[in-house]
């Protein structure tokens, strides 16, 4: 399946929650009414969604949130299932360790999509080496930085200023002057308040 390129607010309305696809410069709630699905008849209540439908919708929501397509998402689940511990928590840990997500969490990109673009345009280094693969898994202790020639880009400066106002997660440490940060660890499940029910995804793939 090709990556969705349409209006981001429409995806958040479809899932009924903020997928953080839009910059926090303007709350997506200003543009998207989460209690209304996209389309002319969005408010019309339909039949009760089946368990399978709920599971499928949750998977779609998380895929869209992290910008991951089905084949790769399935591989993340299989890797999470092989690890010790809770499969759902392992899945989220892998997603949070993606380089594009870490760049976003550090505040170098205002959205994951913008962070992914920075990675693909070779504006990001890991431990001093250029990495242009968005799915690259960052390890605890890795130093992620914006390359010198990209540090003055207005979008990066603005994103970092905004991130400092909103708050940078505890599992990354950022040096705003150097425009670099350290990935301290993958976050524990209770450290980020994303509206995700990962158990539904586990149930779906365990059918």
Curated annotation (Swiss-Prot):
GO terms for cellular component: small ribosomal subunit. Residues 31-53 are annotated as: Disordered. Transmembrane segments: none annotated. The keyword Ribonucleoprotein applies. InterPro entries: Ribosomal_uS4, Ribosomal_uS4_bac-type, Ribosomal_uS4_CS, Ribosomal_uS4_N, S4_RNA-bd, S4_RNA-bd_sf. HAMAP family: Ribosomal_uS4_B. This is Small ribosomal subunit protein uS4.
């Amino acid at each position: 399946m090709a990556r969705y390129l349409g209006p981001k607010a429409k995806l958040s309305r479809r899932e009924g929650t903020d997928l953080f696809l839009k910059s926090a410069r303007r709350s997506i709630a200003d543009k998207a009414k989460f209690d209304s699905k996209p389309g002319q008849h969005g408010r019309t209540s339909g039949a009760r969604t089946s368990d399978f439908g709920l599971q499928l919708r949750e998977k779609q929501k998380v895929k869209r949130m992290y910008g991951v397509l089905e084949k790769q998402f399935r591989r993340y689940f299989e890797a999470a299932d092989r690890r010790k511990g809770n499969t759902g928590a392992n899945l989220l840990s892998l997603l949070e360790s993606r380089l594009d997500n870490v760049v976003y969490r550090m505040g170098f990109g205002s959205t994951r999509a913008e962070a992914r673009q920075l990675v693909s345009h070779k504006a990001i280094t890991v431990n001093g080496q250029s990495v242009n693969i968005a799915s690259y898994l960052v390890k605890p202790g890795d130093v992620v930085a914006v390359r010198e020639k990209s540090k003055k880009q207005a979008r990066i400066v603005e994103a970092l200023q905004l991130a400092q106002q909103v708050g940078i997660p505890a599992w990354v440490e950022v040096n705003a002057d150097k425009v670099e940060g350290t990935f301290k660890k993958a976050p524990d499940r209770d450290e980020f308040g994303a509206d995700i029910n990962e158990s539904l995804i586990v149930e779906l793939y365990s059918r």
